[in-house]
């Protein structure tokens, strides 16, 4: 992976293991720094990608009605604690002028934005803004539901608690009926 200093991550993980009183040379931990470095390269791969790249290919289709891809699974890492949060994203847009993108591109944009140290609010807004800026639709609505391990494993310790964030752009900002339609389809 570009921009990833594996040796530096491995060194830092060894220091953490030592700082908590573990022996990084014991059998179960000897390869842990290497594994963690490799994992970080994978789970943070979106850091050096632009989600807008996924919307470069568009199709002309006589369709100016709602498009919704729901229940897109994702995982990310909380930038405050570097522990996972995971859930589903629902991405809706109304094409303008018949300009549509491949459905998988919506899921790829979610994945790109999620694969970095992140906040759920930022994932939601960045996906919406990327679609709005590249496809110029009538509107975009993104709803993200996630469970945060920083609330499950530590602190308040509330397993199962879900956080829901929304980002509305264009027509969805003012058209309550359109917004309600998306929410109804997500729930249905």
UniProtKB/Swiss-Prot annotation:
Q: Which PROSITE patterns match?
A: GTP_CYCLOHYDROL_1_1 (PS00859), GTP_CYCLOHYDROL_1_2 (PS00860)
| SUPFAM superfamilies, alphabetized | Tetrahydrobiopterin biosynthesis enzymes-like
Pathway noted in the entry:
Cofactor biosynthesis; 7,8-dihydroneopterin triphosphate biosynthesis; 7,8-dihydroneopterin triphosphate from GTP: step 1/1
Disulphide bond pairs = none
The residues the record assigns to binding Zn(2+) are: 78, 81, 150
Q: Could you tell me which InterPro entries the record lists for this protein?
A: GTP-CH-I_C/QueF, GTP-CH-I_N, GTP_CycHdrlase_I, GTP_CycHdrlase_I_CS, GTP_CycHdrlase_I_dom
- Gene Ontology MF annotations: GTP binding; GTP cyclohydrolase I activity; zinc ion binding
Q: Has the keyword Isomerase been applied to this entry? A: no
GO-annotated cellular components: cytoplasm
> Where would one find coiled-coil regions in this protein?
none
Q: Which domain of life is it from?
A: Bacteria
Question: Which CDD domains does the entry link to?
Answer: GTP_cyclohydro1
EC numbers: 3.5.4.16
Q: Which UniProt key words apply to this protein? A: GTP-binding, Hydrolase, Metal-binding, Nucleotide-binding, One-carbon metabolism, Zinc
Q: What GO terms describe the biological role, i.e. biological process, of this protein?
A: one-carbon metabolic process; tetrahydrobiopterin biosynthetic process; tetrahydrofolate biosynthetic process
Q: Which reaction does it catalyse?
A: GTP + H2O = 7,8-dihydroneopterin 3'-triphosphate + formate + H(+)
Does this entry carry the keyword Phosphoprotein?
Answer: no
Q: Which family does it belong to?
A: Belongs to the GTP cyclohydrolase I family.
The annotated subunit structure for this chain is:
Homomer.
The protein depicted here goes by the name: GTP cyclohydrolase 1
Which gene is the coding source of this polypeptide chain?
folE
